Amino acid sequence: SFSSNENQTSIGSIVATDDSESLIYELSGTDASSLSINNATGEMTFNSAPDYETKTTYSAIARVYDEEFFTQKAFQVFVVNLNDNSPAFTSSATFSAAENQTAIGTVATSDADGETLSYSISGTDASSLSINSSTGVLTFNSAPDYEAKTSYAVTVTASDGTNSTTQSI
């Protein structure tokens, strides 16, 4: 079996030896149409870079032959997941909160790579609000008074440690 990082086409080589004759390499089987092999060297590649979030395993059969004999072996290529997707907000960009209470709501996000997300806020009213960096729960630092201010604006950033995205709230 082989392992290959997503978003890259290189897989590795099938290796065979014959003392007297040159060898020819071929692929067949379930996912052979997604792979290529150099018929003289056995070097394999994906025809297009794989995406872990679409398909994680490819199966094929490698056949090596000379002018008289052949051997074949089934193999798999396991696609290695990389942190290549930014988080995405799935909650509304607008929250309504009751006067004289600190609760606002929770920002909801998803990450196609399954990474743990952290949250932060910035912007005009960031000093009036807080966000739990692990859960995305938004709160007022002190209960708001409707007669004093009716609207607050912040930018929430969700990060998976490598990629981040923002939403204005």
What are these regions (language model features)?
Residues F2-I169:
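Acidic, turn/loop-rich segments in luminal/extracellular domains of secretory-pathway
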